[in-house]
Swiss-Prot record:
The active site is at residues 227, 275. It comes from the Bacteria. This is Glyoxylate/hydroxypyruvate reductase A. NCBIfam families: PRK15469.1 (NF012013). Keywords: Cytoplasm, NAD, NADP, Oxidoreductase. It is found in: Cytoplasm. Its EC number is 1.1.1.79, 1.1.1.81. It catalyses: glycolate + NADP(+) = glyoxylate + NADPH + H(+); (R)-glycerate + NAD(+) = 3-hydroxypyruvate + NADH + H(+); (R)-glycerate + NADP(+) = 3-hydroxypyruvate + NADPH + H(+). Pfam families: 2-Hacid_dh_C (PF02826). SUPFAM superfamilies: NAD(P)-binding Rossmann-fold domains.
Amino acid sequence: MDIIFYHPTFDTQWWIEALRKAIPQARVRAWKSGDNDSADYALAWHPPVEMLAGRDLKAVFALGAGVDSILSKLQAHPEMLKPSVPLFRLEDTGMGEQMQEYAVSQVLHWFRRFDDYRIQQNSSHWQPLPEYHREDFTIGILGAGVLGSKVAQSLQTWRFPLRCWSRTRKSWPGVQSFAGWEELSAFLSQCRVLINLLPNTPETVGIINQQLLEKLPDGAYLLNLARGVHVVEDDLLAALDSGKVKGAMLDVFNREPLPPESPLWQHPRVTITPHVAAITRPAEAVEYISRTIAQLEKGERVCGQVDRARGY
């Protein structure tokens, strides 16, 4: 069994050694331009077209929760990956826990009005504020996949009203489910906090725009943990300036790194983190990949395969 590996920023040598230890029967090598030798599996992040094109692979693993970098290249270069080759993403590998930590900490930050107290502190102003009430602090999760379900589970502990929206209806205990475009407005109407965990597909690009933001309650909060292309940044800034949106916590952006001249950096109601809400944990990723390859070799059904038409 031959496995090729490519990631532009990961410690390649660590991954090669870890994969060899986890799959001792495999010959694992770092892929470099010009390497056209045979391979059974490819593990990659933002792979060049040359890496995958023309290969009779058993499967490709994207080294992250999203596969948009591969699917976008496939649109321009359909020869990059044969339709018969299954494409897998890392379904969790520790990312769910990280998303839970990030979402819960920020929701509580807003619920306890720490954002308002920070602004008061900046002007040396001492003024206790009225507390928010849980029953009026509905949290909506936009995108009800694996990570969305993890976030919902963690927020249930805090007894907030929860709702989710996705393409198909979900049956999550304690979570009100909305499905399809025809129910999006009703979903948004009560979301005091909107948490975006949508996949990156042609249908979801620019979904968080002026029209969507206007359907939120006045003074809502936005937490974007998915992709920067989901948000029309000028529309968000306008909503923040008007007070329609009271605050935004943004981990992802249309351009990354976020340019120094972006007005998001200096906006008093915006908090920025550099795409760190959930990062791939190498040891857990290697365990998932080795387990999945073993299942594929046995002809077993496995989780995490991407529907190329849907984009996730």
